[in-house]
Amino acid sequence: MKHYTRVLARVDLDAVEYNIEMMKKNIQKDTQMMAVIKMDGYGHGAVQIAKLLEPKDYIWGYAVATLDEAILLKDACLKKPVLVLGCIFPDQWDTMIRNEVRMTVYSYEMAKEVSELAEAMGCKVYVHIKLDTGMARLGFQITEENAEEIAKISKLPNLVMEGMFTHFSKSDEADKTFTNEQLDKYLWMKEELKKRG
């Protein structure tokens, strides 16, 4: 009797490309997309998918879960930015900064330490702000106090705040009530940050 320990999935890259093109048709023309290809593209080959998407001008970059995944993409000579969505440990920060891997920031204290390290290294660090709009994981809660904290982060030396994101925890459900509440929180924070420059 044969024992199988792994699952094999054959991915049609033409189908992936078609799906991406269909998504692009459903958003505003000047909107860029980020390809989330964490966990090796959910087992479908992150590098192969990234290489397929690399020439697409509407793909801003790639998002992964860990630094190891980011370095794998960097080692594949991809030019577009790579963002680590998950938790990053202080002993990984210098590697991220050296390799221009984008980092998720979820506290002022973390951003300040990262800024100081980048300054000491004579480099810039590119960060994205994670908002917790209801997923209850990492991220800034939606408060005026945190809007102030994020505004302070944007002024730290050697730190470039490139973006802000959240995780819609129930977006695949038919009832969009909770997702719409999350979107409202995100948009509220966006407006609060605009007020603060």
Feature-to-residue mapping (PLM):
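Active-site-proximal beta-alpha core segment in soluble small-molecule metabolic enzymes
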Residues: 3, 7-10, 15-17, 31-196
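Glycine-rich phosphate/diphosphate-binding loops that line cofactor/substrate pockets in enzymes
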Residues: 20-31
